[in-house]
Amino acid sequence: MTQDLVIRNARLRSGRICDITVAAGHIQRIGERTAGSARGEIDAQGKLVTETFVIAHLHLDKVMTGSFAEEAALEQYHGSGMGGTMTAIETASRVKEHYVESEIVDRVRKVLVEAEYHGVSHIRAFADVDTKARLTGVSALLKIREEFKNRIGIQVVAFPQDGIIREPGTEELLYKSMDLGADVVGGIPWIEYTDEDSKKHIDIAFEIAKKYNADIAMLTDDAGDPELRTTEYLASSAIRNGWIGRVAACHARATALYNEVYHRKLCALLKKAEVGVVSDPHTGPLHVRVKDLLDAGITV
């Protein structure tokens, strides 16, 4: 049988050297020397061949907008202790004053071509949904999702960056985003002004997710405040709503400041809810305790 592609002398992460046979867009065999011919052949020369990259959290609607962002926003977000995170987000949100759908599509296309070149196969793409961005970012990402459907798997997240309770009109726009075809319900509950409103934020997201049978991805506790508890409420809500294994918590930086007793209880809850955690180590000085999460059996 003629194969489409054979990658010879590939080194797996285990250190094993083997041939990888590809046909009809799928890996057919990983093993010793592959006999027969192939339409294409690559000699990996003993170098590492591994899985494609997955970007689980990317604000794709905002790529290549650095010229619009103020330096003060970056300084606040990366500051010691991350006490100015909310101010940084509010300052950076001014980029949405420049939102034009066609321009977003053009910027995103350039980034996706580069991502594809570097081996990215899947992206969970966040698009701001609020009274400033309205549906512009979502519409742009839905168009680019279709354009790249045979190249990169893109999930569009309807993301209420500026809150739901504190930003009247956003809840309706989230429903409209899902009607347009967004894949995932987003959230950022800690951005709300009170703990009560943070819980309402999460409750609304679950109502929307259940209506559209959609997964949930939220930015939780993304500041240097050890009193933040939205990761806990998100996990308990996943259990209560029967959304086990369908929820992701991104950033969750405040967990780095939790005392050991509470952190262990939180890990047990996250595992029970099968909540995945996205660490985003390239942004901000605080990070989730990755090793502790992995040791607790949580997907990171």
Model regions and ranges:
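Divalent metal-coordination and catalytic microenvironments
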Residues: 10, 25, 46, 57, ...
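Active-site gating loops and adjacent loop-to-helix segments of metal-dependent hydrolytic enzymes
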Residues: 64-104, 181-184, 212, 230-248, ...
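Active-site core of metal-dependent hydrolases
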Residues: 157-170, 179-299
